[in-house]
Amino acid sequence: MALLGLTLLALAPASNASAQLLAAKDGPIVYGHHHLNVTNLDEAKTFWVDAIGGVLIKVGPENREIIKFPNALILLRAQKPTAGSKGSTVDHIGFSVKNLRQVVDRIKAGGFRMVTSAEAPPNVKVQDDIGIVEAGPVSGIAYAMAPDETKVELVEMKAQAAPIASHHLHFFGMNKEMQAWYMQTFGASTLDSANPAAFISASLPGLTMNFSPSQAPVAGTQGRAIDHIGFEVRNLEAFTKKLEAQGIKLAAPYRQVPALGISIAFITDPWGTYIELTEGLDKIN
């Protein structure tokens, strides 16, 4: 089945998944979902649900499974990816957690790899798979490899209420140009970086976007472990016309899906990141 078809079926209105896009009320464009290609669905669900704490729900007439977190959904496509997330424009996805030690221990107990020592910024000291952070709301960071070499960062924020929530996307490539493009295209705001030596940042309601320079060429996302990222957009049809007027070509045209109460379109950023745009994802119930 085509990826577009899988996306639509996965979003069929048979659950309260919309309750997870908590930031949708806070701006015209917010983050919506990660769409992953996975070799083994059961192994993927073990990581995203049992190990890190997502909630598995079944939606639509065919009981399609998606995984929900506050401020993001994860959609899984049963297809072996062409490569992992490292080496692509979207190096990893990030979640904030209330108790990092517990999550790291569950990941290891599930047989998945912690890669904090290899992946943490060089100015972060690592002890027992956790990078020590001693200032601000973040008290620790860790990195894990989900199935199919999907890189995941976990940021400990002890003050948050939820055990886990969507936190950030981390792009690699032409970082200054990328930051400027996402700010101009999606109305993201500039944000002080949590680690200025390693990356620059921008933000949308419910999402931080970090941008690191890459010494090596990076590839686009489509077909890889993180196939595409998704933004929820108010007045999507008008937004797609605005994009076209700005010279941004639609990879798939605006389309209404009345049976699901949503609209969709796709674009690709200048560096190859495949992006789905949705309207109505925040209202599906």
Predicted features by range, described:
Residues Y31-V38, G54, I74-L76, V90, ...:
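Short, structured motif recognition centered on aromatic/hydrophobic residues
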Residues S18-D26, I29-N40, E65-I66, A83-F171, D192-P196, I200-S203, ...:
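Vicinal oxygen chelate
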Residues D50-L56, F112-R113, Q184-L191, Q246-K249:
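Conserved acetyl-CoA-binding loop of GNAT-fold acetyltransferases
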